[in-house]
Amino acid sequence: MSDIQEPLKTVIQILHDSHKGFMDIGEHLKDQQARSFFLQEASTRHTFERELKTAVGADEDVGGTVAGPVHRAWGDLKANLGGGDHTLLATAEQGEDAAKKAYEEALKSDKLPGNVRELLIRQQGHIRQAHDRVRMMRDAKAA
């Protein structure tokens, strides 16, 4: 991929990972409201990934990051060790931190086509809101 597409490839990979991560964590959460949010968010991330791939003409096989499977496995491991919802929510927040950073890096490029920039800005707004909601859920479970 060209140098303007490399940060976009990272965003696509993060979206792929977060789709899987939200799905995996959502399936382990005991809190039904959090579970519902996570499963819906998994669907949203899948949609975002498809939108961005279409906008930039990316192959279907971009795949996830090397850290993605490790991130998901760590969340599963903590759940299996009895870490519970708080630990899963903390894991998700770490993933959301990576997503926020990926969007920030991609948007630094002054070579992005207008339609791609607009798409990233729209998606980034949602990512920030989701991050804040995950953090609030995590903090509520810590109390």
Q: What are the roles of these predicted feature ranges?
A:
Residues 36-68, 130, 134-137:
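Conserved alpha-helical segments that form or flank metal/cofactor-binding pockets of metalloenzymes
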Residues 3-11, 32-50, 85-89, 115-127:
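Alpha-helical scaffold segments that form or flank carboxylate-/histidine-based iron centers
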Residues 2-29, 87-111:
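Alpha-helical bundle segments that constitute or directly flank the non-heme di-iron/ferroxidase center
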Residues 95-143:
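Preference for long, well-ordered alpha-helical segments
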Residues 51-100:
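Carboxylate-rich helix-loop segments that flank metal/cofactor sites and access channels
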Residues 11, 18, 25, 48, ...:
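Amphipathic alpha-helices that form helix-helix packing interfaces
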Residues 29, 46, 60, 110-114:
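Residues at alpha-helix boundaries and short interhelical turns
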Residues 24, 28, 54, 58, ...:
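General structural signal for alpha-helix termini and helix-helix connectors
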